[in-house]
UniProtKB/Swiss-Prot annotation:
It comes from Oleidesulfovibrio alaskensis (strain ATCC BAA-1058 / DSM 17464 / G20). Transmembrane segments: none annotated. ATP binds at residues 14-21. This is Guanylate kinase. Residues 7-185 form the Guanylate kinase-like domain.
């Protein structure tokens, strides 16, 4: 009898305005096997948030101690607050066969690549710089300096896209989702998800 596969890490990175949130939401709706490990943060809880549900809220001293002990699979400082994903919690989810989705920046993805091996790294690309700028302006929510900063960040992120497993251009939402879905399903067939499969089949060969 073939044992179920272990879980995989699916890491999605994209510049702001590329449509990653919409694609992520659709993937989670279709595949309930995905799970999230609860991250740690030093920021203050917002209204309605609970410790252990949205985040594990800790002070900066505790976070830095955990970071230095190698507790996090990845961590980052964002707007003066620290955020980190617990490594052991993620490993336990994977061992139970749950797939873990990360929606993080390129720096966090690079850290994950070093700490978690069975990962699929997908970069969502805009059709062009001009189209990305059009989308950001169409939101009507960001001031000019924020738009310029997001465009500059997008350029820097694109310069690091070469090491990802898959590139998906979100020019058409349906096509982009089909490609993301295909990349995810292909990753679940990797031998790293069932490293013992062939040896077990050979042992039971008749």
């Amino acid at each position: 009898m073939v044992r179920p596969r272990s879980g995989i890490v699916l890491v999605l990175c994209a510049p702001s305005g590329t449509g990653k949130t919409t694609l992520t939401r659709r993937l989670l709706e279709e595949f309930p096997r995905f799970a999230f490990s609860v991250s740690y943060t030093t920021r203050q809880p917002r209204a309605g948030e609970e410790h252990g549900r949205e985040y594990n809220f800790v002070d900066e001293e505790t976070f830095i101690r955990l970071r230095d002990e190698g507790f996090f699979a990845e961590w980052a400082e964002v707007h003066g607050n620290f955020y980190g994903t617990p490594l052991e919690d993620t490993r336990q989810l994977l061992a139970r066969g749950r797939d873990v989705l990360f929606d993080i920046d390129v720096q966090g993805a690079a850290q994950l690549r070093g700490s978690l091996k069975q990962g699929c790294y997908v970069f969502i690309l805009p059709p062009s710089g001009a189209e990305l700028e059009r989308r950001l302006r169409a939101r009507g929510t960001d001031p000019e300096d924020t738009i310029r900063r997001r465009l500059a960040n997008a350029r820097r992120e694109l310069q690091q896209a070469h090491w990802f497993n898959a590139w998906i251009v979100n020019d058409n939402l349906e096509q982009a989702y089909d490609e993301l879905r295909a990349a995810y399903l292909a990753a679940t067939l990797s031998p790293t998800c069932r490293p013992e499969l062939v040896d077990e089949l050979l042992q039971d060969w008749r």
